[in-house]
Structures are given as structure tokens and as C-alpha cells.
A protein has these predicted regions:
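Two-component/phosphorelay signaling modules centered on CheY-like receiver
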Residues: 7-32
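Conserved phosphotransfer microenvironments
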Residues: 33-70, 77-80
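C-terminal output helix
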Residues: 100-109
Length: 125
């Protein structure tokens, strides 16, 4: 399983890698790399919306245009309820406000993996 992480923060990469290293391949890109569209296909996408990401919906649109509309996206976003709603409405599967609670973050990742498995087995591509 390939997980594509877009984050400008090394700490987010390290936490995500610690969670997923035994059962997936984590591929880390910076948020600016979304513009280039030169990243590999993946089973799951995680996007870290830090304060530098101005247009909250554009990264999801760009990632899904490259990896596919059915690939689930987990958003790391500590924004207003309106920003979080917008991210979910545009196509994020779920969100988490911080990666500091490692157990909650692990649960979100495991949940999105289960959803992806279920979608592939019973849904449509």
C-alpha cells in the first residue's frame, strides 16, 4: 500500500512514518509539489494544511486530478469550522486537527485504509 503525504513539516512526516512504516510505503512531498503534479499514484493521500496553504480546496482538487477521484484523502487541518466543512465538501474523506495525539492520528489512518479496502472490494473504481 502506498500513502502519499503532502506536508511542509518534517515532524508530520516522522509521526506518519512511525505509524505506517511496518505495513505501507510512505512517500513524502512538500505542499509546493502539488503544483508540479510529478508525484506517483497512491492508495491514500494525506494533506497537511498548514498556515501557508491559502486556498484550502485546491490541494485536494490537484491531488485527486492526478491520483484519481476515488482515492481517499485525509486532511490535517486546524481551521475554522467553515474551512473544515469546505475541505470535506470538496472531497476529503476525513480530517484531523493535529497529529500530536498519535493514537487518534493512527486511528484516522487505519480507518481510511479500511474504507479504501472496502471501496475497492465492494465499490467501484
Amino acid at each position: 500500500m502506498k500513502i502519499l503525504l503532502f506536508s511542509d513539516r518534517k515532524k508530520v512526516f516522522e509521526i506518519t512514518n512511525d505509524i505506517t512504516k511496518d505495513w505501507s510505503e510512505l512517500i513524502w512531498y512538500k505542499n509546493i509539489d502539488l503544483e508540479k503534479k510529478q508525484y506517483p499514484l497512491a492508495d491514500i493521500v494525506i494533506i497537511d494544511f498548514d498556515k501557508n496553504v491559502e486556498e484550502k480546496f485546491l490541494p485536494i482538487i490537484k491531488a485527486k486530478s492526478k491520483v484519481g477521484d476515488f482515492v481517499p484523502v485525509l486532511a490535517i487541518i486546524n481551521g475554522t469550522p467553515q474551512e473544515i466543512f469546505s475541505v470535506l465538501k470538496i472531497g476529503a474523506y476525513d480530517y484531523i486537527t493535529t497529529t500530536e495525539d498519535i493514537e487518534a492520528y493512527r486511528n484516522k489512518i487505519e480507518d481510511i485504509i479500511r474504507w479504501n479496502w472496502y471501496r475497492k472490494k465492494y465499490g467501484r473504481e
